[in-house]
Amino acid sequence: MSVAFRRDSDEEHLEPKFEIPIPAGPNMVTQRGLALIQAKVAELEAALPLIEDEAHIVATKRDLRYWRARQATAQLAPAADGDIVEFGCSVRFRRNGKEQLVTLVGHDEAEPASGLISFSAPLSQALMRAEVGDFIAFGGQEDAIEILAITATDRS
C-alpha cells in the first residue's frame, strides 16, 4: 500500500510540548515577587492530585517544574534606599511630555499594563542608576526621559 494512504497516529500530529523557558540571568525578586512564586507552587501542588485528564496533568507538572525552579533560584533583592533608581524602586518620569510611573521588579512579577516592568527590560536598563532631576537617553534620543521622583518600595 502506498504511504499516501497510510494512517498516521494522532500522536504524530500533536504540537510538541516544551519546557517553559527560564529567563537568562539572575532571578531577582521583590518580597511580593517571592510570595507570588511561593503561592503559585502551592496552588499547583494542591491542584495536581485533583486532576484526572492526562494532558492537563502533564501541563500542570510542566508548570510546577518551572515554578519550583524559579522558587529555588529566587534571590531576594536588598532593600533600595530610593536615592537612585534600583531594582524594586518606583520611578516617576516624564517622556514625550507625558508622566509615567513604573516599578522595577523581577521577571515573574512583571505586569507592564500595571506599571510593573522587568528589571531587564530596555526601559528599566535605561533608568537604572539615575537620580531625580537626571535626563537620560532612551530609544535613540538624548534627554528623552526626565526623572521626577524615586520611591523605595516596601520589602517587608
Predicted regions, residues:
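Non-DNA-binding regulatory cores of transcription-related proteins
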Residues: P78-L148
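Helix-rich terminal scaffold detector
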Residues: M1-R70
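Amphipathic alpha-helical coiled-coil segments
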Residues: R65-D81
